[in-house]
Amino acid sequence: MELNVTTLEGNAAGSVQLSDGIFGLEPRKDLIQRCVNWQLAKRQAGTHKTKGRAEIWRTGKKMFKQKGTGNARHGSARVPQFRGGGRAFGPVVRSHAHDLPKKVRALALRHALSAKAKDGGLIVIDSAELNEAKTKALVGHFSGLGLTNALIVDGAAVHAGFATAARNIPNIDVLPIQGINVYDILRRRKLVLTKAAVDALEARFK
């Protein structure tokens, strides 16, 4: 598929040929969902914790005699039935991460890129560079391109001035090509790739 290339100023800068094997697939929601779940599970802290009955400090003395009181037969005040007792089957500190094959992750990324291209949310610019690291100037460029909620992916390294100017703009994320991922692609309305990013993706998946 062929896509027009623009500059940050909104001027035409030719066109680029995109591989159908990366940007022209019929998106599979199941693959994309698996990859997003994998990413979110991996980043979850897992620091939740409650105390069980073995971790509660209370006397071990029997609360009252076994028979003759009319009450249920209790032997410990640490059980979950009582206020201040231990939690039954409560959460413990653990990792929520699970495995996902590398081939599935790579395929999900291609389907996420294809989904953006199919929905018209893919924009290719010639480069992401600024002479001055001025947020106001970059906001003007973005408004000209109609970008209010976007992920911008550059080549191997993001231009320092561009990254500095963009970090104060809400709903705008900037990543190098190594950081491109399914979740960040989907959470923004537009995906903006530089020509360097397109070349890197073509080389990665060829």
UniProtKB/Swiss-Prot annotation:
GO terms for molecular function: rRNA binding; structural constituent of ribosome. It comes from the Bacteria. SUPFAM superfamilies: Ribosomal protein L4. Part of the 50S ribosomal subunit. Belongs to the universal ribosomal protein uL4 family. One of the primary rRNA binding proteins, this protein initially binds near the 5'-end of the 23S rRNA. It is important during the early stages of 50S assembly. It makes multiple contacts with different domains of the 23S rRNA in the assembled 50S subunit and ribosome. This is Large ribosomal subunit protein uL4. The lineage of its organism: Bacteria, Pseudomonadati, Pseudomonadota, Alphaproteobacteria, Hyphomicrobiales. The gene is rplD.
